[in-house]
């Protein structure tokens, strides 16, 4: 219909405008996002296949690989939360937070108290939340409430019913950066079910990781890119003041390689899926996957089945108690083909498994 055609054109125009702005801020960061030659040499000596993977990520997401970074893994949000609180309390210069879902409760109130206090002490506190992810969890104009507390706030793609043709463009990232040298990411949103203070669909099993060191730079830049895109700001990012060593003069520890990266659906390159396909295709011993929604395309199905048929131990874990029954039925519809290929599938009986 003519109205649908106009809607499609408008949707493409909006998407292109966002992509153009994102490309602009990415271009400004290029001089500050180059991999260290020494790090690349170390990675190539350690694993040539990992170096090839790393080079692809750099070329198509613009985020380099780093050394001198420690990573602490948290099996559940219950373990991550007290560490996050501890690190927020130690912030002296800036706290940048970007989450899909924020919901009032024990977790958010605890964090908000710290953010308000830190802002009053002169710490630069900024928050991005998704307009749809927080549609039913935060009051309308919550950004104004936060501004009164000294917290700068931006909403990614605020929900507008009359413009629903662009409402599928969402910010699912979960990022917290503290003073440029400490970062949290993973699947955990800022809501009580993620720390099992609120029961929804049984035990809530999600994971997170804390990075300390040079790789946090990638997460800082991710946030600053999004901040400028939402602001539609032409003011360039002050990269120098956000460098990891700016507020951490001592050398960082860490023996491995860390490469945080982001992906966007607007540029035509499916970096995230390609990285997973590379990992699966190069697996020699095992592939273990956790996912709340097993909805895979032909390429992913072929890769998983071929790995299992080749003798790789392929295991997939899905929720025992789903949050969306129709989506779970779709998830289960993929079981037969995977099982026939030798993939082992488990359902997490204690509850929901949003970890990916």
For each of these PLM feature ranges, what is it?
Residues 1-274, 278, 282, 306, ...:
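N-terminal localization/anchoring segments of enzymes in phospholipid and broader phosphate metabolism
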Residues 79, 106, 295, 349-352:
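Short beta->alpha linker loops
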Residues 293-315, 319, 324:
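Helical hairpin unit composed of two closely spaced alpha helices linked by a short loop
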């Amino acid at each position: 219909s003519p109205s649908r055609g106009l809607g499609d054109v408008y949707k493409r125009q909006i998407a292109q405008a966002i992509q153009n702005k994102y490309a602009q801020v990415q271009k400004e960061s290029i001089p500050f996002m180059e991999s260290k030659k020494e790090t690349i040499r170390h990675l190539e000596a350690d694993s040539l296949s990992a170096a090839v993977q790393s080079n692809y990520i750099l070329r198509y997401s613009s985020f380099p690989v780093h050394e001198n970074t420690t990573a602490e893994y948290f099996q559940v949000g219950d373990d991550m939360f007290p560490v996050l609180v501890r690190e927020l309390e130690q912030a002296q210069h800036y706290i940048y937070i970007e989450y899909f879902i924020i919901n009032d409760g024990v977790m958010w109130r605890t964090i908000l108290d710290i953010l308000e206090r830190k802002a009053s002490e002169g710490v630069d506190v900024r928050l991005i939340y998704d307009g749809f992810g927080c549609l039913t969890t935060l009051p309308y104009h919550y950004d104004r409430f936060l501004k009164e507390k000294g917290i700068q706030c931006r909403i990614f793609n605020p929900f507008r019913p009359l413009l629903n043709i662009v409402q599928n463009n969402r910010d699912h990232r979960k990022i917290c950066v503290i003073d440029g040298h400490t970062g949290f990411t993973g699947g955990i949103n800022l809501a009580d079910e993620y720390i099992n203070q609120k029961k929804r669909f049984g035990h809530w099993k999600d994971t997170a990781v804390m990075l300390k060191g040079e790789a946090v730079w990638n997460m800082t830049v991710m946030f600053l890119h999004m901040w400028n895109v939402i602001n539609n700001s032409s003011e360039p990012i002050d990269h120098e003041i956000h460098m990891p060593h700016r507020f951490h003069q001592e050398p960082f520890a860490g023996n491995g390689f860390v490469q945080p990266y982001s992906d966007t659906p607007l540029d035509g390159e499916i970096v995230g899926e390609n990285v997973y396909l590379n990992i699966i295709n190069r697996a020699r011993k095992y592939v273990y996957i956790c996912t709340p929604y097993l909805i895979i395309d032909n390429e992913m199905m072929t890769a998983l089945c071929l790995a299992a048929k080749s003798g790789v131990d392929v295991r997939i874990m899905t929720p025992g108690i789903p949050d969306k029954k129709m989506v779970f039925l779709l998830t289960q519809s993929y079981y037969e083909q995977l099982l026939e290929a030798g993939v082992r599938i488990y359902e997490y009986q204690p509850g929901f498994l949003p970890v990916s």
